[in-house]
Amino acid sequence: SNTTANTLKMASLCVAAGARPNVISETIEAVSAARLELTKQIMQTIAFYKDNRVATIEISPAVMAILGDDTDGFVDIIRNVDTVDVAILLKGESPNRTRISLRSKGTDVNAIANHFGGGGHIRAAGCTIEASIDEAKSRLLEVIK
């Protein structure tokens, strides 16, 4: 976790100075109806593999054109499933180019990303595969043990 005793101390000082945590939280968590409609579409793409240890979620090129880089949180939705070890977010940049975000609870996803020319950290990594979302997903699933 990135939350330390110092983080909480600073938060305490902010509240003592007049910061209103509920207002901050509501502002950060606010979502438009349009964003929720897109989220609904994205949620319908969730799939599980390898005895529910691997989960995928997809964002089509059309939806990516609307969202831009605002894809935070989607990979966490599937990573938080109790049986899931490897969570894969597949973002279609174009019909034949897919950007991948990998997260894990135990598996070295950096090794998986390296296989496709990407990299990162043991528990969080990424890569780009010159293929459609379906083809990229198939290639990834072949590599994941």
Identify what each model region corresponds to.
Residues S1-H115, G120-I144:
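Hydrophobic helix-and-loop "lid/oligomerization" segment in the mid-to-C-terminal part
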